[in-house]
């Protein structure tokens, strides 16, 4: 990133959220603790014993947080990249998002990799420790459609904020 983008500010934020994706990502998008989401937005809360996807309402929770925070409509897109087709669409259309006040892109690859790392024998060997895991992640990023899309924005006037719901 350093070769293509100027880092104006680097901050770290910490929380007491559970590291499970279903809690942490919903909390990031809602701006609330899991217990507050359950209390105030029960229609978007999915309990552990329910078979429904636990992160199906990120967009709705983000919309609610924006309304609470800005108290006005903003031009926004939320893109959740869960497959190659969506990744290609994002890459092809990335410049269109420059007109937005906010564009949120969720890339599920790191989640998939972290879960597969403990379940698939080949990944257990390839990512046997943190150093190997980070190396695989870096290699993926450098060859990903996400990086390709970001490089198309080189020299454009926009702010990029990178966040994660993973501790490492």
Cite the ranges covered by each PLM segment:
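Feature captures the catalytic ectodomains and active-site-proximal regions of enzymes
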Residues: 1-168
């Amino acid at each position: 990133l350093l070769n293509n983008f100027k880092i104006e500010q680097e901050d770290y934020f910490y929380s007491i959220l559970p590291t499970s994706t279903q809690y942490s990502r919903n909390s990031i998008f809602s701006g609330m603790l899991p217990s507050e989401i359950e209390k105030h937005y029960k229609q978007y809360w999915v309990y552990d014993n329910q078979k429904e996807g636990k992160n199906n309402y990120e967009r709705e929770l983000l919309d609610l947080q924006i309304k609470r925070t800005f108290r006005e409509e903003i031009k926004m897109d939320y893109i959740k990249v869960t497959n190659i087709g969506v990744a290609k669409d994002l890459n092809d259309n990335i410049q269109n998002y420059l007109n937005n006040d906010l564009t949120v892109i969720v890339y599920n690859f790191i989640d998939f990799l972290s879960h597969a790392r403990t379940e698939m024998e080949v990944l257990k060997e390839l990512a046997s420790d943190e150093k190997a895991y980070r190396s695989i992640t870096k290699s993926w990023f450098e060859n990903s459609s996400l990086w390709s899309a970001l490089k198309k924005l080189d020299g454009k006037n926009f702010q990029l904020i990178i966040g994660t719901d993973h501790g490492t």
